[in-house]
Structures are given as structure tokens and as C-alpha cells.
């Protein structure tokens, strides 16, 4: 593995940055329709969609926590997709740290029948993933927060593991639970539209140190009570409706190549709603082409020349099919 060329000396603590955001959730739990519980271990559970109603605003705030306090998530109207007027727009001025170092759901947590992928700042304290060796970044903080796309409270064994791996006492740990079928869960997944672009940039071996800035948007899908359909819709919002604008250093040739390879349509599995693709491989994620997970359209701007390169396309027809619209 090559040594990181990223300059992380001025990178802040994502856990320290999110402490005030987590406090805001707790202090405004009733207004946000959240349930807050202290477990016997001392850990705090924020329910954003299991017993609690949650909602769009809760999901928006949770998405900003996922981004380590380095991202802004906005919900606004848009005419891009006439049947789906609400859009999530995401921006980070440090997309590598915010999206890969914090937001990416890369920490596998399991015990007996419980399984969830942890995302958010707590990952950067544990540093359990190979990704952190590549980034050359490890956080330092006295409190940590993780977001779990789960409809179950993590068992004591998982909480103990997180405390052990992060070096944080359980009473300073917060777990935010956002089931995929919930409104908050839907928002925080679609708000990963910039993150999936960064993850694919990393997969394509484009130099992360050349990524200067980034912004992206994707339509807000209707939630679904069925897990598979709900998961499919949140993925398809990005695969068919996501548009990322990435600002990079380096040659025009490298920027043009990235614009061509980055969109979801560059994948062999593109062309059907995600739920259908998932069923076709017997619900085995590892059989899906990893190049599929990216925004539908991309704009890559080479900041040193000022030239921009366009790749992919938005697909309203496939989006309507996935979201359950019938004329």
C-alpha cells in the first residue's frame, strides 16, 4: 500500500466537531420526534425511526453528523424530476475527510443475530479499516458518535467493542439508529450522494490528494415499508438521480477520464432498479459490480485549467419505475 500523500496536519477532529450537533439532537428530541435513552452501560441511544417517528429534518441533521460536522445538507424543491420535487443537496469543503473519513459506512459491527455497518465520526477514533492507513488520519476525542442503519438497539457486546476500539468510555458514546424504511433513514442514505462519488473515486485509484472540493444532489424518494424496496429506492435516488460536481487538481486528461468512469452508467449492472439487481444475485452484495455505486451524472472541473468534463446522465424513467410512480 502506497504511503498517503494527503496533508492531514490541519485536519480537525470529526468527533469534536460533531459534539454540538449531537447535543442539538438530544436537546431538541421532542421537536424532532426522536427518542433518547440511556442504557445501563451509560451509552446514549437516539432512536430516529424504530419506536420514534423521526422525520426529514432529523435525517438532515443526522446526515450532517455522519459527515463529521464538515458537510452541509439542505432539503429544497427542484424541477429536475417533475414527479419528485424535493431534492437533497450536499456540500463539503473537505470531502475526503468528511465523506471517506467519517460518513462512509465501513465499520462492520456484529454479535449473534445483530449486524450493522457503522458510519460517522466514531470510525475515525477506532481506525479499524484499512482506509485509515491510506488516509493517514486518526482522530482523538473523549466522546464519539456512530450512526447505524438498524431497526434494533445494539447489544451490550457491540457497545463494549465500540468503547474498547475507540478508547471512549461507554457513557460518552452515542448511537443514532436510522432504519432504512424510516424518513430519517431515507434522508441520511440519500445524503450520501457525494460520499458514493468519493468512494468510487477512491476505487478508481484517482489520487485523493487531487480532490479539492465537492458538491452533489439527489431526489428524495418515498420510503417503503418493505426493506428491499426501501433500500432499492434510496440507492436508485443516487444511481439514476444523483449529480456530483467534483473539483480536482491535475491534468485535463485525468479529469476527463474520471468523468467518463465515475457515473453509475459505466457499470455492467446499470439499467434496472437496484431491488431487481439485488434479487438477481440472491441478495449477495459482493456479486454486484462495485462500479455501480455512484451518481448518475458527474461534472469534473479541473481547477488549474478551468475546464469541466461531463459524464453520465439522469434517468427520470428508471427513477419513476423505482419510486413506484405510475401515470
From Swiss-Prot:
TM region(s), chain numbering: none
Which E.C. number(s) belong to this protein? 3.5.4.27
Q: Which Gene3D superfamilies does the record associate with it?
A: Methenyltetrahydromethanopterin Cyclohydrolase, Chain A, domain 1 (3.10.340.11), Methenyltetrahydromethanopterin Cyclohydrolase, Chain A, domain 2 (3.30.1030.10)
What does the entry give for GO biological process? formaldehyde catabolic process; one-carbon metabolic process
Q: What class of enzyme is it?
A: hydrolase
Q: What is a single cellular component term in the Gene Ontology annotation? A: cytoplasm
The main place the protein resides is cytoplasm
Q: What does this protein do?
A: Catalyzes the hydrolysis of methenyl-H(4)MPT(+) to 5-formyl-H(4)MPT.
Q: What is this protein called?
A: Methenyltetrahydromethanopterin cyclohydrolase
Species the sequence originates in: Methylobacillus flagellatus (strain ATCC 51484 / DSM 6875 / VKM B-1610 / KT)
As recorded in Swiss-Prot or TrEMBL, the protein's gene is named mch
Amino acid at each position: 500500500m502506497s504511503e498517503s500523500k494527503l496533508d492531514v496536519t490541519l485536519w480537525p477532529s470529526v468527533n469534536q466537531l460533531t459534539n454540538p450537533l449531537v447535543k442539538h439532537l438530544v436537546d431538541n428530541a421532542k421537536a424532532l420526534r426522536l427518542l433518547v435513552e440511556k442504557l445501563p452501560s451509560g451509552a446514549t441511544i437516539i432512536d430516529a425511526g424504530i419506536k420514534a417517528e423521526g422525520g426529514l429534518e432529523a435525517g438532515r441533521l443526522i446526515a450532517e453528523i455522519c459527515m463529521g460536522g464538515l458537510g452541509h445538507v439542505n432539503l429544497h424543491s427542484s424541477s429536475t424530476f417533475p414527479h419528485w420535487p424535493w431534492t437533497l443537496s450536499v456540500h463539503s469543503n473537505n470531502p475526503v475527510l468528511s465523506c471517506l473519513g467519517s460518513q462512509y459506512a465501513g465499520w462492520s459491527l456484529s454479535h449473534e443475530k445483530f449486524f450493522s455497518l457503522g458510519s460517522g465520526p466514531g470510525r475515525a477514533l477506532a481506525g479499524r479499516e484499512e482506509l485509515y492507513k491510506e488516509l493517514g488520519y486518526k482522530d482523538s476525542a473523549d466522546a464519539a458518535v456512530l450512526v447505524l442503519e438498524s431497526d434494533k438497539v445494539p447489544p451490550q457486546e457491540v457497545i463494549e467493542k465500540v468503547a474498547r476500539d475507540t478508547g471512549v468510555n461507554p457513557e460518552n458514546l452515542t448511537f443514532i439508529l436510522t432504519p432504512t424504511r424510516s424518513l430519517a433513514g431515507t434522508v441520511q442514505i440519500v445524503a450520501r450522494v457525494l460520499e458514493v462519488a468519493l468512494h468510487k473515486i477512491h476505487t478508481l485509484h484517482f489520487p485523493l490528494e487531487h480532490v479539492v472540493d465537492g458538491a452533489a444532489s439527489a431526489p428524495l424518494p418515498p420510503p417503503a415499508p418493505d426493506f428491499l424496496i426501501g433500500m432499492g429506492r434510496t440507492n436508485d435516488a443516487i444511481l439514476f438521480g444523483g449529480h456530483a460536481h467534483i473539483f480536482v487538481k491535475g491534468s485535463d486528461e485525468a479529469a476527463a477520464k474520471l468523468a467518463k468512469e465515475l457515473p453509475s452508467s459505466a457499470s455492467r449492472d446499470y439499467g434496472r432498479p437496484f431491488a431487481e439487481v439485488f434479487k438477481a444475485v440472491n441478495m449477495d452484495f459482493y456479486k454486484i459490480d462495485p462500479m455501480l455505486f455512484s451518481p448518475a451524472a458527474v461534472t469534473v472541473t479541473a481547477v488549474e485549467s478551468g475546464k469541466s468534463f461531463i459524464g453520465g446522465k439522469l434517468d427520470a424513467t428508471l427513477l419513476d419505475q423505482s419510486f413506484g410512480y405510475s401515470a
